[in-house]
């Protein structure tokens, strides 16, 4: 008997489906820096920026982010155009921060405070924020006051940074909204910094990432390579992207600094409703959680953020219940 069954159809061979490109992490919805920058508009308000504008490999206007002077002028233009900060400058070799990422931290902190305020973001001078390690750039107080009207105290151990930040604050007429003070004891973070009567709704911190100068230099070299600008002749690269030693490294590195911050926060549990810090390395989260448990934190939150291909996060913790934390 003849087999009339049709042979099984072969599945047509299709080319392998290309892997989808990783989605770029998006900025917080309230972040002012969505999409491409309008360089014509930036140059109109800050003509000095024109000298630093280049075309990137995609034919788009940009700047050379390996050039500290270009980054400084670019930041000055952004602060003027987006935040009304007319006067901003920092000493040579001090940290020049990426503004969109710094703004994101503040927006997510505002969301955190809203959770204790019936979903409404608290705004105005009644909200007090403490910026630990404000730096010469004073960036968090400037952005936070512009976006939300909060009052800020910025602290630092570096007298030059304090002087530069104070100059920025005074030049922009913000002395009633932002104050800066020096932590006199370089071995302490919070202790000895605050008056016993002071109360803050939130604290924020961008801690030193590295545990030594050599580690910081290797990190700088990786950034050079990412920009295709590594100098193979240098055994130890110059610290690029700005940053004094105390801004980039400390004994114990990021985890050492954050652990000390947690320990000191437990000694001042009612003076800050929500303590927080950026955490650059996700691998540091387990020991941070352990330190917070040991310190007796009542509630802990990890908030993931992303700018472009970069992922970042901050940890927030409190020793107070919701009723005690409510802005008022």
Swiss-Prot record:
Keywords linked to the UniProt accession: Cytoplasm, Methyltransferase, rRNA processing, S-adenosyl-L-methionine, Transferase
MF-aspect GO terms: 23S rRNA (adenine(1618)-N(6))-methyltransferase activity
Annotated compartments: Cytoplasm
EC assignment: 2.1.1.181
Any single Pfam family the record assigns to this protein: Methyltransf_10
Any one Gene Ontology cellular component term annotated for this protein: cytoplasm
Family indicated by similarity: Belongs to the methyltransferase superfamily. METTL16/RlmF family.
Role description: Specifically methylates the adenine in position 1618 of 23S rRNA.
Protein name: Ribosomal RNA large subunit methyltransferase F
Organism whose genome encodes this protein: Pseudomonas syringae pv. syringae (strain B728a)
